[in-house]
Design a protein with these regions (language model features):
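Membrane-proximal basic amphipathic "stem/tether" segments
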Residues: 1-40
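C-terminal segments of enzyme domains that contribute to small-molecule binding surfaces
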Residues: 2-11, 113-148, 180-221
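Flexible, glycine/small-residue-enriched loop-and-beta-strand segment within the central core
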Residues: 43-44, 48, 53-150, 179
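A generic "structured core" feature
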Residues: 99, 137, 155, 159-161, ...
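Conserved catalytic-core motifs of eukaryotic protein kinase domains, centered on the activation segment
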Residues: 104-106, 170, 186-188
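Short-chain dehydrogenase/reductase
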Residues: 141, 159, 175-176
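Catalytic-loop Lys-Pro-X-Asn motif of eukaryotic-like protein kinases
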Residues: 144, 162, 172
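Acidic, glycine-centered active-site loop in nucleotide-sugar glycosyltransferases
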Residues: 172, 177-180
Length: 221
């Protein structure tokens, strides 16, 4: 764990927990297994499960990332407020240019500007509001340049098409697209979805996953 300490890794190094180079860490950063972090700025209360891969991204706030999830930059940012959370499940894929932000400017006052922070020396939270935590469940794929807004829950197995703006909850195994994003279709039939949900494969340990190669490589409808 990196606790309230600022580190800039100038050269590649490897420990039992993390492979890292050219990163900046600040805050309470916890690694629960091996991960690969490259060219990132990571600040706040952030936890990584095993085998997380993050490249060229910015993370700030209260964020948890499940095992085997990957986040790719450049220009990818995941941000929460001091009181909010972003929770990302296991086996998720987040592409370049994705913006995930748990809070917004307050716009029902005289100015939407951060006037409290920048003029009256108040904490940033004075100028922000949230519709709630952002929850991204297991096996979600978020395409390039998507925006995920405050209070959204993206359910297991969903796919978010590139360039979408997600302003409301996404149903399990849905494919959604657009601004604002709307459901295009389901990935699979209800029978297949029931089979996958019953299997709970995202909870399997790595040895069981490897023993069931055909389960994962099989095309489904």
């Amino acid at each position: 764990m990196i606790n309230n300490f600022f580190i800039c890794f100038k050269l590649f190094f490897e420990t039992g927990r993390v492979k890292s180079f050219f990163n900046i860490f600040r805050g309470k950063i916890k690694f629960y297994g091996k991960s690969i972090i490259q060219e990132c700025k990571i600040c706040g209360n952030i936890s990584f499960s095993e085998n997380v891969k993050i490249n060229n991204s910015f993370l700030s706030g209260n964020i948890s990332i499940g095992r085997f999830s990957s986040i790719n930059g450049p220009n990818t940012s995941i941000i929460s407020s001091e009181s909010g959370n972003v929770k990302i499940g296991s086996f998720c894929s987040i592409a370049r240019g994705v913006q995930i932000q748990e809070f917004n400017h307050k716009f029902n006052r005289t100015s939407s500007y951060y006037i409290g922070q920048n003029i009256f020396n108040k904490p940033r939270i004075f100028d922000t509001e949230s519709k709630g935590d952002i929850i991204i469940e297991d096996d979600v794929w978020i395409g390039a340049n998507c925006i995920i807004l405050s209070g959204v829950k993206i359910s297991r197995g969903a796919i978010i098409a590139a360039g979408s703006v997600v302003i409301k909850d996404v149903a399990p195994y849905s494919i959604i697209a657009g601004v604002p994003a709307k459901q295009i279709k389901k990935r699979f039939s209800e029978k297949t979805i029931e089979l996958l949900e019953k299997s709970k494969w995202w909870t399997w340990d790595i040895s069981k996953i490897k023993e069931n190669e055909q389960f994962f490589l099989k095309e489904r409808s």
